[in-house]
Curated annotation (Swiss-Prot):
Name by which UniProt lists this protein: Ribonuclease Y
InterPro entries to which the protein is assigned, alphabetical: HD/PDEase_dom, HD_domain, HDIG_dom, KH_dom, KH_dom_type_1, KH_dom_type_1_sf, Ribonuclease_Y, RNase_Y_N
UniProt-listed GO biological process terms: mRNA catabolic process
EC number: 3.1.-.-
Domain spans labelled HD: 332-425
CDD domains assigned: HDc, KH-I_RNaseY
Keywords of this entry: Cell membrane, Endonuclease, Hydrolase, Membrane, Nuclease, RNA-binding, Transmembrane, Transmembrane helix
Length: 516
């Protein structure tokens, strides 16, 4: 029963819901239909308005198109007129140019015709001139007795002789003028420098003499079975010569430092009176220390005398060793001091750094202090030493260039070379061995005799002048100037010599006849 009631309620609810839904649908349909009708009406109004607007714009667009078309048409007509006018002007210019070109072409054709005529005339004249030239040459050859080639050679030789003469005269004039001016200035500088410098001359020797209180001392120096003299010779490297010379012992050796060490040691032994191997060894050791001290003191004294400071202590010691070195009889240390002083004086006259000039002059021969201990020339050794002890590039170049091995890089190097030459070349500064002297003179004569046209030559004035006799038929007066110049250059390049050598070329013609 309850179930039936529930079912009846459910069915009733469903029916009520269906009725309500249907009513809602009907109401909504009416509302929608009302809205649709309203929308259709508005749509028709909008369409009508749009049609009216479109018609208006269409008419406006047609009007604008017509106006633009008319404007474009007018512009095209204007441009067409302008182009036609420009084309007409261009045609006129072309016509004018064509007329001008025609006139020029006509004138050119006339000129070409004239030119052809002139060329023909020139060809005719050229043939006539050539024929005339051949006739003249033949006539000249007939008159002079020379062919054209011979005449050319004669003319060339004549011109060459004239040029040689003018060249020789010009060279002589320029050399004379340059020499006068250079010699005047150089003499002023050198004379001033030499007047302010005075240096000693030391004769080269390989022996030293030790005076003895009496001849009995000779026996004590020799010792039992000669052991004393052998010990002294072994320790010093010097030969002791004991002969009939009264109260004297001669020390002979080529190393002056060893000879000086032996002299001091022997004098100490003589004063002490105790002469035996142990005492000799002790005295030699003392003498070596004394000589080393003397070397350093001499080096310091040299730097003080010249006025050069800041030199490396080892270079100062090597300067001191140069006191015991000689070259051709000239003491190496005295020579270096003299070069330093002269370099400073010359630098002061010229106006360059006096301090560096003195320094370079003092060190220019530093390699001579050890050239007997090391391989190489004293120049290269000196350069290596200066580089090792941080000398300036100017000083190094002066050391390297003072014998002409390299080019000068500063005025200082030129000054040092000049001072070195002055010191070495002054009278009495150096002496040569007889063999070296004669070889140098022979070399000088051989060099001059090797030139064409030289008959004989004589080296005179101790090799400071060479007189060259030439064959007069082979060497003219003008050739003498060139020959003297060539001889000077040859001597400079092949011969080593102190100072200058005067080249005197002599051309002499002699005619001999006899009166009968």
């Amino acid at each position: 029963m309850l179930i039936k009631i529930v079912i009846a309620c459910v069915i009733t609810a469903i029916i009520v819901a269906l009725i309500a839904w249907k009513s809602a649908i009907s109401y909504y349909k009416k509302v929608v239909e009302g809205k649709i009708g309203s929308a259709d009406e508005k749509a028709r109004e909008i369409i009508d308005e749009a049609l009216k607007t479109a018609e208006t714009k269409k008419r406006e667009a047609l009007l604008e198109a017509k106006e633009e078309s008319l404007k474009t048409k007018n512009e095209l007509e204007r441009e067409t007129k302008e182009r036609r006018a420009e084309l007409q002007r261009y045609e006129k210019r072309v016509l004018t140019k064509e007329e001008t070109l025609d006139r020029k072409t006509e004138a050119l054709e006339k000129k070409e015709a004239k030119l052809v005529a002139k060329e023909q005339e020139l060809d005719r004249l050229r043939v006539e001139v050539e024929e005339s030239h051949q006739k003249q040459v033949a006539e000249l050859e007939k008159i002079s007795g020379l062919t054209s080639e011979q005449a050319k050679e004669y003319l060339i030789k004549t011109v060459e002789d004239e040029v040689k003469h003018e060249t020789a005269v010009l060279i002589k004039e320029l050399e004379s003028r340059a020499k006068e001016e250079a010699e005047k200035k150089a003499k002023d500088y050198v004379v001033t420098a030499i007047q302010k410098c005075a240096a000693d001359h030391v004769a080269e020797t390989t022996i030293s003499v030790v005076q003895l209180p009496n001849d009995e001392m000779k026996g004590r120096i020799i010792g039992r079975e000669g052991r004393n003299i052998r010990t002294l010779e072994t320790l010093t490297g010097v030969d002791l010569i004991i002969d009939d010379t009264p109260e004297a012992v001669i020390l002979s050796g080529f190393d002056p430092i060893r000879r000086e060490t032996a002299r001091i040691a022997l004098e100490k032994l003589i004063v002490d009176g105790r002469i035996h191997p142990a005492r000799i060894e002790e005295m030699v050791e003392k003498a070596q220390k004394e000589v080393e001290t003397m070397i350093r003191e001499e080096g310091e004294a040299a730097t003080l005398e010249v006025g050069v400071h800041g030199i490396h202590p080892e270079l100062v010691r090597l300067l001191g060793k140069m006191k015991f070195r000689t070259s051709y009889g000239q003491n190496a240390l005295k020579h270096s001091i003299e070069v330093a002083i002269l370099s400073g004086l010359l630098a002061g006259e010229i106006g360059v750094d006096v301090r560096i000039a003195k320094r370079a002059g003092l060190l220019h021969d530093i390699g001579k202090s050890v050239d007997h201990e090391m391989e190489g020339t004293h120049v290269q050794i000196g350069v290596d030493l200066c580089r090792k002890y941080k000398e300036s590039p100017i000083v190094i170049n002066a050391v390297e260039a003072h014998h002409g091995d390299v080019e000068f890089q500063s005025l200082i190097a030129c000054i040092v070379q000049a001072a070195d030459t002055i010191s070495a070349a002054r009278p009495g500064a150096r002496r040569e061995t007889l063999e070296t002297y004669t070889n140098r003179l022979k070399q000088l004569e051989d060099i001059t005799n090797g030139f064409k046209g030289v008959d004989k030559s004589f080296a005179i004035q101790a090799g400071r002048e060479v007189r060259v006799m030439v064959v007069p038929d082979q060497v003219t007066d003008d050739d003498m100037v060139l020959l003297a110049r060539d001889l000077s250059k040859k001597i400079e390049s092949e011969l080593e010599y102190p100072g200058m050598i005067k080249v005197n070329v002599i051309r002499e013609s002699r005619v001999t006849d006899y009166a009968k």
